[in-house]
Design a protein with these regions (language model features):
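Serine/proline-rich low-complexity intrinsically disordered segments, especially terminal tails, linkers
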Residues: 10, 32-35
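N-terminal secretory signal peptides that target proteins for export/translocation
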Residues: 1-14
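Ala/Thr-enriched low-complexity intrinsically disordered regions
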Residues: 3-5, 20, 36
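Bacterial N-terminal signal peptides
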Residues: 19-30
């Protein structure tokens, strides 16, 4: 009888031990199937991360758009005036102004109304598509109507984008009170400091600021 009792106790203990282990396993499985503590904020964290990613993508797109944009926004800081050209049709520059086999490398015809107080004008043609490549740089301009081919070859070189491409060419007519020491920037070369060099026109040769009265702008594309 005692032997049977001992076997019964051992068997009961084994059953209890097995049940305890099973309960522990069930508890572990239930914990694994439930969200961990603090994960209630996970959807919000994902949302914030997605928002941040979206913002980053937007910033990249904005930067790319800014890089592609032919328009230098800082020009808006100045008063403006209208510039017209008979060398521009439907937003496209005529072949004659280009430095290609189908052009004559003649500077575009330009015309504008005189700006009050302006002693002279500076003319710049910029290709923002090619790191602000400067195609035209004339200073001490006193006329307000320039014929096609007015600029010399030392001041003007027409558009010559790579074959199969389209570039934008912007002409700025800057009305100044007085002459500047020099118009900065590489003619027929890249100008990574285009904005800084442009703003330098606001200081005259005597060091006086506020030299830029207004800026006229005309823009068009050319394809090769």
């Amino acid at each position: 009888m005692r032997t049977l009792a001992r076997h019964s106790v051992k068997r009961t203990g084994g059953i209890l031990k097995a049940l305890t282990m099973m309960a522990a396993i069930v508890l572990c499985l239930s914990l694994l199937s439930e969200p961990a503590y603090g994960t209630e904020s996970k959807p919000e964290s994902i949302g914030l991360r997605n928002a941040a990613d979206e913002k980053q993508v937007t910033s990249v797109k904005d930067a790319e758009a800014e890089h592609r944009s032919p328009y230098n926004a800082f020009i808006d800081d100045y008063e403006s005036f209208e510039v017209t050209s008979s060398s521009l049709h439907d937003g496209v520059w005529d072949n004659i102004i280009s430095n290609t086999d189908k052009g004559s490398n003649k500077s575009p015809q330009l015309e504008w109304t005189a700006v009050d107080g302006a002693g002279l004008y500076v003319i710049i043609m910029d290709d923002p598509t090619a790191m602000d490549w400067m195609h035209w740089k004339s200073d001490h301009v006193t006329e307000t109507s320039l014929d096609e081919g007015w600029a010399s070859s030392s001041e003007y070189v027409g558009p010559y984008p790579p074959g199969g491409s389209t570039h934008t060419y912007e002409i700025y007519v800057v009305a100044l009170k007085a002459p500047v020491e020099r118009v900065k920037g590489a003619f027929n070369g890249q100008n990574p400091k285009f904005e800084k060099n442009f703003q330098a026109l606001d200081i005259d040769a005597d060091g006086n600021s506020g030299n830029i009265l207004a800026v006229g702008r005309i823009s068009g594309t050319f394809s090769n």
